[in-house]
């Protein structure tokens, strides 16, 4: 097999993985119930929808703008990822799959993550606007 044919085969495999991988495992990692003894439940407590710390348009003035994005890939961080000062991300932050933290995730100040998931994330709670 020539080098060009091998590279063409690899490019086609990547394209097929990109197209078919969008719909595989869409419910992986998105639970339908509240986790952490109800802290992430649907209505009250920490990160609830409407009441509690960092609820949607709730405590500390943390409002939620629109979110949308998609992507496939792996991001690996080995070691430290220090961030000093203010870090703002404007635009899209595409995440498909699971997000896992091994060890402590320390933060000083206010940290809020708001967004809108696709219909499969959070089991498509249409009555709540799909917020997860």
Swiss-Prot record:
Residue ranges, annotated region (Central domain): 66-113
Source taxon at top rank: Eukaryota
Residue ranges, annotated region (Right arm): 114-132
UniProt keyword terms in alphabetical order: Repeat, Signal
Transmembrane segments: none
An example Gene Ontology molecular-function term: structural constituent of egg chorion
Keyword check for Transmembrane: no
Cellular component aspect of the GO annotation: egg chorion
GO terms for biological process, alphabetical: chorion-containing eggshell formation
InterPro entries with a match to the protein in the record: Chorion (IPR002635)
Sequence similarity: Belongs to the chorion protein family.
Designated name of the protein: Chorion class A protein L12
Organism annotation: Bombyx mori (Silk moth)
